[in-house]
């Protein structure tokens, strides 16, 4: 005669357990940091990415590291006057680093520069090198950050090496050389947040010039490095140098500036950058399906190491105002 009561109690226990599990699952889902890509919400791929997101939101640590008074600014001085002394400014015309990605099929060459969509453009040029192989691999352009699908296949370190490999004339030809350029301040803030905030400080003496989260310290030390390398008093280069040295030092622009077409970087690529790139792709007779694939990657998918719009980016940009 106790069976109905026992059954009811058993059912109640099961319902309580299910409800508890549901609450735990919902709580875990809500508590996970997420990254937004257009209207899609995507959880971080790894625990490392979750830790990176936490660092990008840790404003208390950033404020504490930058609580000092900024050095006084020079007023009423033009860039021309400021750089009139040889040892004050770095030379404009200097070769530092060139990383070219080639699509022989469409006679396209793109020079990638760190913090100017280098990962995404590396993916785009690899896709144009062999659309079928890239599509069949199931990769996205963001995957190029960790492993390059076209490593040692379509990569060159000088414009002359590309010319020699494909017998390209030294005058204007049907080959298209391009480079994405970015506002220097925007590029600096993005690079600083990427290298000095997002990435865990594993080497306190070397990484970010040993300055941690202190941007003023970093700028002063990187300026010293820039001047030392400018006048060949120092030859050792760091990842920081690659991310912060002038864009015009890249891509052999000191000798081949007139051969390049420039695409203006934008945090909203749909408004400026993509129309320019699409016009170039059409000019080089890239099929509409391939253009659509590239647009989808560039417009609706975000690089996993992008720092745009994060509290860290907003804070460090405010230090300029």
From Swiss-Prot:
What keywords tag this UniProt record?
A: Membrane, Transmembrane, Transmembrane helix
- Compartment list: Membrane
- Per the record, what is one GO cellular component? membrane
Membrane topology label = Single-pass membrane protein
Asked if Transmembrane helix is a keyword of the record, the answer is: yes
Molecular function per GO: chondroitin 4-sulfotransferase activity
Q: Does the keyword Membrane apply?
A: yes
Give TM segment ranges: 11-31
Task: Name a biological process GO annotation.
Answer: positive regulation of response to oxidative stress
Q: Which PANTHER family match?
A: PROTEIN CBG14245-RELATED, PROTEIN CBG14246
User: What family is it from?
Assistant: To C.elegans C41C4.1 and C18B2.2.
The protein's name is: Putative sulfotransferase vep-2
Tell me the organism.
Caenorhabditis elegans
Q: What is the lineage of its organism?
A: Eukaryota, Metazoa, Ecdysozoa, Nematoda, Chromadorea
